[in-house]
Amino acid sequence: MVTQYIPLKEKYEKEVVPKLMKEFNYRNINQVPRIEKIVINMGIGEGSRNADLLNKHLKELAAITGQKPVITKAKKSISNFKIRKGMNVGLKVTLRGLRMWNFLYKIANIVLPKVRDFRGLNPNSFDGHGNYSFGLTEQFVFPEITPDQSPKTQGMDIVIVTTAKTDAEAFKLLEFLGFPFKR
């Protein structure tokens, strides 16, 4: 269990909820959108044929998230990618609760400012149902990973799942939490 102090959760409860209630005219606090979970997905490419590389990426993702990843397997064979059904093709972690809030804080305040040539998150990456997706091209922006200990640069996809009904609600939720969006 994570017992770390969660500044972002406190900010959500004390600052973001009242702002969202005022902006969207919610009458009940349960109508306010909240973040349900964060899903981090990492495709491993040639790691499907190299068990050592798979284990290194598994340890990296575990260090980044604080939770052991699940190995995802191919659902069907694709000859062009040299993938057979059942081969390991990726790693996935679903974060909820305190780990989710810690990861959100780390993404917004530590990781995104370290991304090279970062000009803000794309505000058009919402899925129409209030969920936000973005990708990172390398894992070295996380403080837990150093370039000399990692064998290969590996990107990842991050999906923030919210209870928001519209993209506008989700956008304001993430913006009030401190996510830097492009203008």
Swiss-Prot record:
GO terms for molecular function: rRNA binding; structural constituent of ribosome; tRNA binding. InterPro entries: Ribosomal_uL5, Ribosomal_uL5_bac-type, Ribosomal_uL5_C, Ribosomal_uL5_CS, Ribosomal_uL5_dom_sf, Ribosomal_uL5_N. GO terms for biological process: translation. GO terms for cellular component: ribonucleoprotein complex; ribosome. Keywords: Ribonucleoprotein, Ribosomal protein, RNA-binding, rRNA-binding, tRNA-binding. It comes from the Bacteria. This is one of the proteins that bind and probably mediate the attachment of the 5S RNA into the large ribosomal subunit, where it forms part of the central protuberance. In the 70S ribosome it contacts protein S13 of the 30S subunit (bridge B1b), connecting the 2 subunits; this bridge is implicated in subunit movement. Contacts the P site tRNA; the 5S rRNA and some of its associated proteins might help stabilize positioning of ribosome-bound tRNAs. PANTHER family: 60S RIBOSOMAL PROTEIN L11-RELATED. This is Large ribosomal subunit protein uL5. It comes from Pseudothermotoga lettingae (strain ATCC BAA-301 / DSM 14385 / NBRC 107922 / TMO).
